[in-house]
A protein has these predicted regions:
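PAPS/PAP-binding and catalytic site of the sulfotransferase fold
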Residues: 30-43, 147-148, 169-173, 247-272
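Hydrophobic/aromatic beta-strand patches that form the interior of the parallel beta-sheet core
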Residues: 21, 45, 157-160, 246-248
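Long, charge-dense
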Residues: 179-203
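A long, hydrophobic alpha-helical segment
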Residues: 126-131, 135-151, 208-212
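PAPS-dependent sulfotransferases, especially Golgi type II membrane carbohydrate sulfotransferases
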Residues: 1-21, 198-247, 253-331
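Conserved phosphate-donor/acceptor-positioning beta-strand/loop module used by diverse small-molecule
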Residues: 136-139, 153-174
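P-loop (Walker A) phosphate-binding loop of NTP-binding proteins
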Residues: 25-26
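PAPS-dependent sulfation machinery
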Residues: 50-136, 196-207
Length: 331
């Protein structure tokens, strides 16, 4: 169709979801803990994994979707998502999944919604309640300008989870993600073609180096470059966007969760539900950190020295220094 500017996609005259939380971070960084906490704040909906938001963000970052198109679909999707949650549609009722309301004891609220009448009365109820909807994403911050732009004032809090990068590298390697992503049929990450090779979308900025690396070096590169993107994007945020961005450090969250919960409540203009202690007990928060969270540089290098060149040892040292300097601003 010609004259695309004349017919550019928009969703500017309809609005359902007005209180969005983006919950973002690397795998094993503690997102599910914070997602469960969000569900026990007043007006908080239960968190669910919906890959549509991150896939839209990825396609926009890769230049495959315009800002206008991506923004319009983001708004459509979150409004539709909230409406469906409000009538018990598309809720994950698998009892063993972390992203199921059964996991945190909120199943009765969503099961009751299944039998409720749908339609305009639901919209009126949503507008009256003004619910908070958390959107769970994976390693998008650093590539996520479109989420700020697309959601605009609807985005009330962008939470970025951080954790000891040596632990994340160790976990990524032990779980063999390098040989699962874009290779196994049950993997659903966005993939890209690079020189007739299929690579994960998040390595496109260092694809050549990634292709030459061994499996363990690929794990190092993945976390190293992700964290560099996080540091860079945060420091370049405008003050209004920085104000709604919350850095949560896993090691601090575990021992002092109320440090973050208080900030979340203030940012979202809400408070803890009367049964909030129930979820803290279920999540075993606060608690002491286990030994793996203290994975030191020396132990890490000793464990993996046979798989690391001097170059990668240098990258690890740089990453650790930069990480400690960055998180010192938030704890």
């Amino acid at each position: 169709m010609k004259d695309s500017e004349k017919y550019r996609p928009v969703r500017n005259t309809q609005e359902i979801a007005k209180n969005i939380i983006v919950l973002d971070g690397f795998s094993s960084s503690g997102k599910s803990l914070v997602g469960s906490i969000c569900g026990y704040l007043e007006r908080g909906e239960y968190w669910q994994i919906n890959y549509t938001y991150e896939r839209l963000s990825i396609l926009n970052y890769l230049g495959e979707m315009s800002d206008d198109s991506t923004s319009a679909i983001l708004k459509l999707e979150v409004d539709n998502h909230l409406y469906n949650l409000s009538i018990g549609r598309d809720v994950n009722f698998r009892k063993t999944d972390l992203s199921s309301p059964f996991y945190d004891g909120r199943e009765s609220a969503y099961l009751e919604r299944i039998s409720e009448k749908d339609g305009d009365s639901v919209i009126r109820a949503i507008i009256k309640k003004n619910p908070i909807i958390p959107l769970h994403m994976h390693y998008i911050f650093g590539h996520s300008d479109i989420l700020f732009k697309g959601f605009g004032d609807k985005l009330k809090l962008y939470i970025v989870m951080l954790r000891n990068p040596l632990y994340l590298i160790d976990t990524w390697h032990r779980q063999n993600w390098v040989n699962l992503i874009c290779k196994k049929e049950r993997d659903f990450h966005m993939c890209c073609n690079y020189n007739n090779h299929v690579i994960p979308w998040f390595v496109v900025d260092y694809a050549n180096e990634y292709q030459k690396a061994n499996d363990f070096e690929k794990a190092v590169l993945t976390v190293y470059n992700y964290y560099n993107k996080v540091f860079e994007m945060y420091d370049k945020l405008s003050e209004p966007r920085k104000t709604k961005t919350m850095i949560i450090v896993y090691e601090k969250l575990i021992v002092d969760p109320n440090f973050y919960v208080d900030t979340m409540c203030a940012s979202l203009k809400t408070k803890r539900r009367n049964d909030f202690d129930k979820i803290m007990k279920r999540l075993n928060l606060p608690r002491d950190l286990d030994d793996s969270s203290f994975l030191s540089h020396d132990i890490f290098i000793k464990t993996y020295k046979d798989q690391l060149s001097e170059k990668y040892i240098g990258l690890l040292q740089e990453l650790e220094v930069n990480y400690r300097a960055f998180i010192s601003r938030f704890i």
